[in-house]
Each structure stands twice: as structure tokens, then as C-alpha cells.
């Protein structure tokens, strides 16, 4: 059984027991949360597709950890103009473990 839900402006395909990395959520570690923006649910035989969301669809998860991703470097460069600019960024994330999928 798997589901596709929306969180942080992105869509995620998940199964029960899977750990997913999402955009930072404000929930506390260990807290259980529900995602109600479910776009699709499949149980192996039938597929339910929402238009755009499934009424009563729910993905239950538990917040495992918060953290920051690896640093990326942003470099601006203009040739022959003696212009170089370098900047770094580390994006915040939240790891959640999928507990259940309810259709």
C-alpha cells in the first residue's frame, strides 16, 4: 500500500514504515502528525485518485528528527570584470516516519 501526499509544496510517494525527508515542520520530535492533503492511494489492486484531493484520505506520521542538509555553494562570476561572489546555504529539513495510511 502506498500514497502520494503533499507537504511543503512538494509531492511525496510513501509506504508504511518508510522514513521521508520533508521541508522543515514546526512540530516537536516524537510528535505524531497527520497529512490530509492526500492526492492518491493504492492498496495493490485498486487505485484511488483525488480531484485534486481524496476526501477522508490521511497519512499518519511521527517526527523523528530535525536537521540541516549539506552545504551548497552559490557562485556568481563575471568574466573579465574582476567580479566573484560566493555564498553558502544549508536547508532545514524534518525526517518523518510514516505510521499509517488511511483511505
UniProtKB/Swiss-Prot annotation:
Keywords: Ribonucleoprotein, Ribosomal protein, RNA-binding, rRNA-binding. GO terms for biological process: translation. GO terms for cellular component: cytoplasm; ribonucleoprotein complex; ribosome. It holds the Pfam family Ribosomal_L21p. It comes from the Bacteria. GO terms for molecular function: rRNA binding; structural constituent of ribosome. InterPro entries: bL21-like (IPR028909), bL21-like_sf (IPR036164), Ribosomal_bL21 (IPR001787), Ribosomal_bL21_CS (IPR018258). Belongs to the bacterial ribosomal protein bL21 family. Part of the 50S ribosomal subunit. Contacts protein L20. NCBIfam families: L21. This protein binds to 23S rRNA in the presence of protein L20. This is Large ribosomal subunit protein bL21. It comes from Hamiltonella defensa subsp. Acyrthosiphon pisum (strain 5AT).
Amino acid at each position: 500500500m502506498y500514497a502520494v501526499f503533499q507537504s511543503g509544496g512538494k509531492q511525496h510517494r510513501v509506504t508504511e514504515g518508510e522514513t521521508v525527508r520533508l521541508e522543515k515542520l514546526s512540530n516537536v520530535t516524537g510528535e505524531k502528525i497527520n497529512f490530509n492533503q492526500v492526492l492518491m492511494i493504492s492498496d495493490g489492486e485498486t487505485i484511488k485518485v483525488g480531484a485534486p484531493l481524496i476526501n477522508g484520505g490521511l497519512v499518519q506520521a511521527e517526527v523523528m528528527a530535525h536537521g540541516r542538509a549539506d552545504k551548497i555553494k552559490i557562485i556568481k562570476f563575471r568574466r573579465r570584470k574582476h567580479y566573484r561572489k560566493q555564498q553558502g546555504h544549508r536547508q532545514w529539513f524534518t525526517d518523518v516516519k510514516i505510521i499509517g495510511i488511511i483511505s
